[in-house]
UniProtKB/Swiss-Prot annotation:
Gene Ontology biological process terms, A to Z: bacterial-type flagellum assembly; bacterial-type flagellum-dependent swarming motility; protein secretion
Family the UniProt entry places it in: Belongs to the FliP/MopC/SpaP family.
Keyword Repeat: no
NCBIfam families: fliP (TIGR01103), PRK12797.1 (NF009438)
Topology of this chain in the membrane: Multi-pass membrane protein
Pfam families in UniProt: FliP
Disulfide bond residue pairs: none
Any one Gene Ontology cellular component term annotated for this protein: plasma membrane
Subcellular localization, as worded in the UniProt entry: Cell membrane; Bacterial flagellum basal body
This protein's name: Flagellar biosynthetic protein FliP
Location, primary (coarse class): membrane
UniProt cross-references to PROSITE patterns, sorted A to Z: FLIP_1 (PS01060), FLIP_2 (PS01061)
Species whose genome carries this gene: Aquifex aeolicus (strain VF5)
InterPro entries named among the record's database cross-references: FliP (IPR005837), T3SS_IM_P (IPR005838)
UniProt lineage: Bacteria, Pseudomonadati, Aquificota, Aquificia, Aquificales
Length: 239
């Protein structure tokens, strides 16, 4: 047992001795290259969270997911299709903001015309600009109150910190999404009520009304060109 432990310790020492040393050379004006790489990898790992927090993805995926429930087909389209459609629509909606970040922040940073700090400030400015445009005023004021930030101390909306803007934006997106879903539910609910009334008047109580109303709801949605109407309405709600 002691021999095995000794061999294990010596092997570990040999392995660690083979690891090349990491040199950190501090440059002038910018962060160390190694620190930059660490920051890049950290941001890359946070992409799913960033996608949800800073973009229109939340509203899109909630509306499209609950639309399936309204039609009566909770498994169709499948989640993969809903998420894929939401992603492409998100990139479509966010393109003006992405173009601004690319031209005003990323390209100057690549050309080494601005510092790391200025780069992050510009990215924050354009991301915050998008979120503030689609955040309800009352929701923003509520989160300012929770954060104990007096409204009088905020002269411009862009002075509000991200820790306030992000949750206010997400709550506003959820509220808007549920308002849209409520309006989408109404025509399908009417179809369910009409079918249920007809079945009861005919004395047919053993067959679930949803089973009969489902083909009519699908036909109504297709004839009204529902997918195009819903998608275009979602996109235009950000313009």
């Amino acid at each position: 047992m002691r021999k095995a432990l000794t061999i294990l310790i010596l092997s570990a020492g040999f392995v660690f001795s083979q690891i090349p040393p990491i040199e950190l050379k501090v440059g002038e004006g910018n962060l160390v290259d190694s620190i930059r790489l660490l920051i890049f990898l950290t941001i890359l790992s946070l992409v799913p969270s960033i996608l949800i927090m800073f973009t229109s993805f939340t509203r899109l995926v909630v509306v499209l997911s609950l639309l399936r429930q309204a039609i009566g087909t909770p498994q169709a389209p499948p989640n993969q299709v809903i998420i894929a459609l939401s992603l492409f629509l998100t990139f479509f909606i966010m393109k003006p903001t992405i173009d601004k970040i690319n031209s005003e922040a990323l390209q100057p940073y690549i050309r080494e015309e601005i510092s790391d700090e200025e780069f992050f400030k510009r990215v924050e400015f354009y991301a915050k600009d998008f979120m503030l445009k689609h955040t309800r005023k009352e929701t923003l004021e509520a989160f300012l109150s929770i954060a104990k930030i007096p409204k009088d101390s905020v002269k411009e909306p862009h002075e509000i910190p991200l820790r306030v803007v992000i949750p206010a934006f997400m709550v506003s997106e959820l509220k808007t999404a549920f308002e849209i879903v409520f309006l989408l539910y109404i025509p399908f609910l009417i179809v369910d009520l009409v079918v249920a009334s007809i079945l009861i008047s005919m004395g047919i109580i053993m067959i679930p009304p949803q089973l009969i109303s489902l083909p009519f709801k699908i036909m109504l949605f297709v004839l009204a060109n529902g997918w195009e109407l819903v998608v275009l309405s979602l996109v235009r709600s950000y313009q």
